[in-house]
């Protein structure tokens, strides 16, 4: 039988219940007949209150009428001064608005998100207005609750779940948590109560007013079990008590519940902001948090078992692919990444799905499918509940309700609707299973169980095939001993039962991967300090235990580099970077570092300097890890590694200068002369490896600061200082930001001794003084240093002035003999002080025939021949300087190529030793050919 024919019967049935007053409103339109046939709930209320139908006819429901709920309800309560009248009006208001919402959603006068918002705002209005009315009455009876300073204290109500997310369904419980800001006592009452007593009594009254069944029904079923300690806990808690609870005892399911928590009725008031900020760190962790996957998986398993136990069939909320699974999917990403991606910290499921698509955490097709299924199921759920105002998500088993739903959902019959429901839920179930999985294990169980015995019992596996074939019996025994020592170290740490469970699940998987490596013992000895450092921070253990990809990368990178192992140990936040192998081994474009850092810093409030310092360090460490991973994988050749490290440093310098500038301008205003010039009148010049595009993994930054500012200029702020003093303090601030040690360490070590007159000179020089010094006072070694100098930060005007000074200085005519002698003597001093004394070793940098010799040759040639060939001053890096020497025939092309080849070869070895955290010293018989090329050129240019 079609839904239309059944509807005619339902209309006939509904008419039989009509009251005399309702019949007086006949004739009824076709739409009205359909509505009466659909909803016995609405029919019953219109039978008793036929004037509600008159109001619908005169002012049909519209999508934004939720904006009037508060004013309408307050007007009706103007003269109410007792609880009985309050309860009656609240119930009547609730029923009338639900009838209007039922009409609106049945005829699709507004879409599903709008319906959910109307239902949520209705509940919020009823709760908040009732609370305010009762608060006034309680204050009259017991006085006003105040803090120690006499400031009145409000009751704040956290709406949880769908109410908090503005996604409430038609017939729903409401989950609430009550809180108040500070302890104290009431003032102005007949007798004094402490605030806890006052708010407990207020909370009890509010629950009664909303929840109690009267002749008019009820407003909402109130559930307070989500509060701290559940039913055994106090009904109301102070902010401090709440914070203590969630920091010390908050559980995973409570984090899940708090994702949608929203302060009802007063989101913009000061106490609401305080409460939200207090709860945010509990819900959203600063690191990527994988612990939630297993927790949500366990919760889903519990729900599934309950569904089976209670024989729930066709449940569109709790069944496979139902509404709850869509909520789980979005909240997985919110809880895992919400601390790092503030856009995910939304109460709205649909908003979060859009962000998930934007961040490419799921494909656009998957998020679109989830949104489509969600809206379909939520409309179905609301229609189902509006039939009889019953809190149910189970599809009906009677023909009448099946016909009602099929008609309202736009289907000809139940079978077509049911088929569509199954298709929508099946699509959700596939995505849910791929993301969260089932609570079972099937991966290499036999091998892992062997290593489980090794970990738990200290017994080596019987089969040697589980180890790399190159590992001897002694190696395997040493692995066993390393694990024993590791277990002893762990026993001295504070680690709870959950942490032990995760570690016991992780270690067999880790050992199964490590023991297949030829350097298994070395890798294990590098990884165990990392594990020891995070063993009390269960989330990181869960990250490796949960993600096989992360675990694989940890083993691979620790195998390749102790430097990376040490970085991960010192800064476990870097484990987050291993989640995406595509980005881990995909170099950023060189010009993208500044924009990437800018976007990274958008997550941090500009005024929070401490967080920004931490963010800068975390960004640097994450990018260093990526560059090192790309270096190890052979994605980047050695020269490109230095390019990336240099561009990274430049991006950070720009960010630090801007942060320091903002700080100074807030205190003193800008130097007044900037009104007549573009830019900041300030420059940062990079020397040494930074200037020469040759930074290594642990290089310092050699910086010189310049300014362009006339004498006797003041700043424009309320607190004025001399502008040159401003620039001096700016440079000091920059160095402070670089060198401050936070929990993530120092950003860079900064060396400013290459400035004019060295440590005895001014920290910041005017560009004019710099020009004068370079041309008239600087030593030859300072001109050598100037060759490798380039401006890292500065406006166009300063850039041109610096470039002119550098070019003119390097092009000065020099006595060739004197120059050669001074460069040679400086090089000899360096060899005496820095080169190793053992004849059987070779320092890649300091020994004769090493990198420094190549640098001195290039620098000598620039100083010697730039007067003749001014174009030789163009570049600051050694490779391109040597290319210029060949181009202008200062040296033969063959000599330039051999020096370049030697330079790149030695630099490559230097990088690999840095990754292994080894000194830049090799055996004396290494790189003989390259050293001979260098010594031959050195003898030709510096020793003749």
From Swiss-Prot:
One GO molecular function term of this record is: ATP binding
Q: What CDD domains does UniProt report for this protein, alphabetically?
A: NT_GlnE_GlnD_like (cd05401)
Question: Taxonomy-wise, where does this protein's organism fall, top ranks first?
Answer: Bacteria, Pseudomonadati, Pseudomonadota, Gammaproteobacteria, Enterobacterales
Q: Please report the name of this protein according to its UniProt entry.
A: Bifunctional glutamine synthetase adenylyltransferase/adenylyl-removing enzyme
The UniProt record lists the EC number as 2.7.7.89, 2.7.7.42
Q: Which reaction does it catalyse?
A: [glutamine synthetase]-O(4)-(5'-adenylyl)-L-tyrosine + phosphate = [glutamine synthetase]-L-tyrosine + ADP; [glutamine synthetase]-L-tyrosine + ATP = [glutamine synthetase]-O(4)-(5'-adenylyl)-L-tyrosine + diphosphate
Which portions of the sequence form the region Adenylyl transferase? 448-944
Picking any one GO biological process from the record gives: regulation of glutamine family amino acid metabolic process
Q: What cofactor(s) does the depicted protein rely on? A: Mg(2+)
Q: Which residues form a coiled coil?
A: none
Protein family: Belongs to the GlnE family.
Biological role = Involved in the regulation of glutamine synthetase GlnA, a key enzyme in the process to assimilate ammonia. When cellular nitrogen levels are high, the C-terminal adenylyl transferase (AT) inactivates GlnA by covalent transfer of an adenylyl group from ATP to specific tyrosine residue of GlnA, thus reducing its activity. Conversely, when nitrogen levels are low, the N-terminal adenylyl removase (AR) activates GlnA by removing the adenylyl group by phosphorolysis, increasing its activity.
- Which organism is this entry from? Proteus mirabilis (strain HI4320)
């Amino acid at each position: 039988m079609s839904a239309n024919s059944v509807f005619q019967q339902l209309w006939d049935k509904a008419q039989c219940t009509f009251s005399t007053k309702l019949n007086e409103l006949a004739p009824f339109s076709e739409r009205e007949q359909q509505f009466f046939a659909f909803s016995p709930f609405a029919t019953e209320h219109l039978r008793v209150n036929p004037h509600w139908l008159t109001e619908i006819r005169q002012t049909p429901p519209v999508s934004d009428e939720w904006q009037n709920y508060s004013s309408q309800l307050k007007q009706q309560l103007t003269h109410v001064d007792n609880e009985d009248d309050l309860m009656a009006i609240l119930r009547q208001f609730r029923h009338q608005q639900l009838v209007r919402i039922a009409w609106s959603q049945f005829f699709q006068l507004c879409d599903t998100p709008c319906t959910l918002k109307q239902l949520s705002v209705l509940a919020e209005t009823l709760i908040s207005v009732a609370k305010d009315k009762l608060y006034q009455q309680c204050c009259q009876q017991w006085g006003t609750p105040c803090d120690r300073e006499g400031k009145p204290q409000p009751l704040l109500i956290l709406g949880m779940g769908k109410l908090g997310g503005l996604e409430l369904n038609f017939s729903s419980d409401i989950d609430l948590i009550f809180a108040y800001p500070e302890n104290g006592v009431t003032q102005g009452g007949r007798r004094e109560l402490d605030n806890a007593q006052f708010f407990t009594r207020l909370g009890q009254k509010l629950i009664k007013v909303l929840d109690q069944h009267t002749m008019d029904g009820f407003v909402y079923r109130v559930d307070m079990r989500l509060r701290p300690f559940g039913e055994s806990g106090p009904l109301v808690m102070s902010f401090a008590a709440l914070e203590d609870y969630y920091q010390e005892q908050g559980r995973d399911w409570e984090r899940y519940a708090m994702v949608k928590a929203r302060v009802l009725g007063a989101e913009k008031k000061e106490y609401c902001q305080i409460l939200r900020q207090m709860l945010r760190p509990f819900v959203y962790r600063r690191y990527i948090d994988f612990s939630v996957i297993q927790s949500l998986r366990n919760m889903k398993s519990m729900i599934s078992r309950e569904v089976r136990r209670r024989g729930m069939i066709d449940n569109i909320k709790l069944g496979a692919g139902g509404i709850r699974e869509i909520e789980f999917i979005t909240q997985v990403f919110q809880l895992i990444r919400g601390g790092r991606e503030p856009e995910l910290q939304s109460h709205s499921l649909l908003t979060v799905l859009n962000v998930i698509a934007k961040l490419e955490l799921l494909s656009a097709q998957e998020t679109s499918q989830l949104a489509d299924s969600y809206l379909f199921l939520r409309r179905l759920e609301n229609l189902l509940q509006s039939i009889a105002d019953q809190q149910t998500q189970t599809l009906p088993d009677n023909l009448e309700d099946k016909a009602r739903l099929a008609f309202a959902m736009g289907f000809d019959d139940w079978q077509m609707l049911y088929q569509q429901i199954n298709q929508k839920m099946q699509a959700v179930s596939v995505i849910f299973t791929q993301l969260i999985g089932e609570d079972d294990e099937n991966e290499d169980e036999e091998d892992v169980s062997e290593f489980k015995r090794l970990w738990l019992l200290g017994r080596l596996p019987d089969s040697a095939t589980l180890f790399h074939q190159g590992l001897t019996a002694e190696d395997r025994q040493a692995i066993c001993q390393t694990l024993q020592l590791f277990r002893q170290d762990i026993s001295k740490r504070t680690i709870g039962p959950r942490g032990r469970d995760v570690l016991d699940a992780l270690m067999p998987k880790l050992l199964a991967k490590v023991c297949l490596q030829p350097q298994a013992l070395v890798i294990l000895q590098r990884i165990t300090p990392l594990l020891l450092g995070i063993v009390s921070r269960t989330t990181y253990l869960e990250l490796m235990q949960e993600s096989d990809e992360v675990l694989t990368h940890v083993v691979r990178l620790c195998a390749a580099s102790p430097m990376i192992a040490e970085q991960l140990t010192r800064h476990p936040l870097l484990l987050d970077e291993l989640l995406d192998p595509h980005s881990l081994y995909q170099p950023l474009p060189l010009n993208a570092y500044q924009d990437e850092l800018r976007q990274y810093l958008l997550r941090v409030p500009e005024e929070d300097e401490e967080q920004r310092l931490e963010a800068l360090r975390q960004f640097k460490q994450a990018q260093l890890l990526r560059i090192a991973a790309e270096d190890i994988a052979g994605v980047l050749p050695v020269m490109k590694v230095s390019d990336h490290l240099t561009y990274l440093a430049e991006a950070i310098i720009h960010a630090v200068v801007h942060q320091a500038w903002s700080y100074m301008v807030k205190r003193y205003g800008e130097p007044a002369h900037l009104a007549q010039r573009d830019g900041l009148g300030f420059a940062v010049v990079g020397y040494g490896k930074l200037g020469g595009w040759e930074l290594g993994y642990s290089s310092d930054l050699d910086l010189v600061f310049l300014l362009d500012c006339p004498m006797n200029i003041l700043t424009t702020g309320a607190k004025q200082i001399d502008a040159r003093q401003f620039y001096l303090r700016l440079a000091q601030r920059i160095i402070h930001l670089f060198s401050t040690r936070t929990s993530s360490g120092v950003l860079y070590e900064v060396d400013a001794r290459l400035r004019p007159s060295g440590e005895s000179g001014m920290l910041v020089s005017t560009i004019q003084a710099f020009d004068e010094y370079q041309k008239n006072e600087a030593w030859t070694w300072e001109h050598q240093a100037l060759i490798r100098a380039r401006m890292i930060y500065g406006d166009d005007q300063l850039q041109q002035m610096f470039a002119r000074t550098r070019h003119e200085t390097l092009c000065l005519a020099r006595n060739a003999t004197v120059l050669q002698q001074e460069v040679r003597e400086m090089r000899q001093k360096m060899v005496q002080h820095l080169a190793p004394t053992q004849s059987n070793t070779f320092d890649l940098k300091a020994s004769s025939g090493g990198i420094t010799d190549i640098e001195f040759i290039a620098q000598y040639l620039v100083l010697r021949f730039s007067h003749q060939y001014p174009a030789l001053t163009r570049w600051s890096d050694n490779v391109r300087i040597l290319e210029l020497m060949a181009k202008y025939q200062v040296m033969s092309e063959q000599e330039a190529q051999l020096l370049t080849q030697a330079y790149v070869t030695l630099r490559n070895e230097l990088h690999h030793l840095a990754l292994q955290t080894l000194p830049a010293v090799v055996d004396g018989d290494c790189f003989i050919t390259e050293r001979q090329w260098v010594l031959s050129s050195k003898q030709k240019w510096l020793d003749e």
